[in-house]
């Protein structure tokens, strides 16, 4: 008697379903991909209870014949490949013949389909993979597949499902990715009778992006294009000022298939170079057309991982396309704008005769307790803004009512502000150790700063500066060299930390409400977690498609911080599933101190330099900037004498002393 048996087909399909069907979103993905392969131009996805109760996908594609319909539930039965050679030149999204049998084995499935060649269609009903009904019916050309009671016979899988809102967010994300991959198809997603996504299907990728991420986001995206003999790269990338807290907004498409690829993600970030802040990621939609022989999609059950030949060449192509596109934009603010913390750009060129003969310098204002640039040639006043240079511009209004097609309440065009995402204020080269996305590392930094003890600072006598970066001072312990940027970062950090430490739970009504726009999946996740935002005084109301409105703000948040602050709190919530005023304010103090500190290569006059050292001496910890870098180093008199060999020690080299 043999111990090895061939598994029944239904059981084999259920085992395969464990790899192919992880959650309701997996079913939506497989059914929609089949509809795309059937050359559909319109696809409608309807779901109930986040797909656990019902998923229905309707398309106007080629349909199936009466003879092919029962074969579609047979494992490894497919119309997309017929020979081994076809496996290496796949242009369809599906090809294994596993998805539909796997879905049918763990649900009740109803299929209505018809082709153009016949006068009638077909109906198939199956439960648990067993066909119960197969008959001729009257139905339009195309296919309608309804999946009900998903996982009814695999209760263990149901146990690992997340909340309905979380599962719905996964479905929205799948439909959004497929919409971006195929802008020529009109997609509609309806959940419990409510329309969540709709694209026009015009073939214009920019319109598809606008339908998913919103018109305001699309306006801040640049077109990219590059090609060589093997690859053709095109798509859209966001300006460096428009970023998100994770990589979820980076979409890479290969021959119309959404894939995940770490190296290509790295190439995208390399294309931005130092223009992105550490821990921030751009919004990217990149379409790569490639010879199927150079891409192996048969390496993962969900086909989201693809092996690509000549991957290094493709990485270089992507990086070059992005960097060249960004070069054409005016991304670098002038020094005066940066130091004055202005959010308004002035592009008028002064005449050469108006330029001063002396070099630009930094000066200290004791009344304002801050540094400023004295520039006689500049006559126009630049308004001061806070922390984020990307804070909301009061001149930005909602100009067209059609931007809010589903508003429950009509608000005049000039009575709301569109909140802007915060711009990057410093780059990886400023602080390579600061990663706001690494919550564990950030938490360690905040704990270290919180537990700092009062330090005693030596009395210093300033006497000079080098390269507009380092200050020289002497004390009784010898020579001190101070990093002026790190020094003022420490001063500013402790100032902002103390200033914004108190939190008031009161709310203040906004004269002009703010609108906050999110992607479909983030919008759904935030609705589920809104109670956590309410606990810290942020009350967002649903206002139209993927949009919230804020009518009042907590007192602890300044009005000029509202746009950037609310987005930061929402990003924190989406990233960590928690939101903390303490963490937000600590991060804010760190980043404000960096933003508002003097940079390298700026000369200080003697008064400003001496005043900076006096402020530094009053700090709780004057020896390190908030990121942990040293503020100053010391050479004692003995060190100096050893370096100049005024002191010789027997049998001890200068290198062993570590001082030369």
From Swiss-Prot:
The keyword DNA damage applies. Keywords: DNA damage, DNA repair. One of its GO terms (cellular component) is mismatch repair complex. GO terms for biological process: mismatch repair. CDD domains: HATPase_MutL-MLH-PMS-like, MutL_Trans. It comes from the Bacteria. Pfam families: DNA_mis_repair, HATPase_c_3, MutL_C. PROSITE patterns: DNA_MISMATCH_REPAIR_1. GO terms for molecular function: ATP binding; ATP hydrolysis activity; ATP-dependent DNA damage sensor activity; mismatched DNA binding. Belongs to the DNA mismatch repair MutL/HexB family. NCBIfam families: mutl, PRK00095.1-3. This protein is involved in the repair of mismatches in DNA. It is required for dam-dependent methyl-directed DNA mismatch repair. May act as a 'molecular matchmaker', a protein that promotes the formation of a stable complex between two or more DNA-binding proteins in an ATP-dependent manner without itself being part of a final effector complex. This is DNA mismatch repair protein MutL. The lineage of its organism: Bacteria, Bacillati, Bacillota, Bacilli, Lactobacillales.
